[in-house]
């Protein structure tokens, strides 16, 4: 019934973490099934295979990949509040990986294989990763994302 569905959604959203709360404990929750919620900032319009859930300031996002009962994310979800159930994953970029990326970028730039705007964007990403690693005394830059299982639109 609709009342049962509403109760289920309410119980999901009551235990759902906000983006910043999830990121604060992410290193301890990798490979755990988690529930979090927030507004959809962006959906990938070509494939619909991922969306990005933001914190209240729109400065921090977590990527959600399709999986489980989620077949795609449609554009109509943008600006909707959703509660996502999924498995928290991490992608690690070691210092060595970043060094190699930077070297390859410089070589491509020297050969004229990439346009300036693309190179500037990648250089900025590399710089931000290095700054974060230095500030946090880490030997790798970690990006957390969620392999989706299901989601509910929060009323």
Question: Over which residues does each language-model region extend?
Answer:
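OB-fold and OB-like single-stranded nucleic-acid-recognition modules
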Residues: 1-155
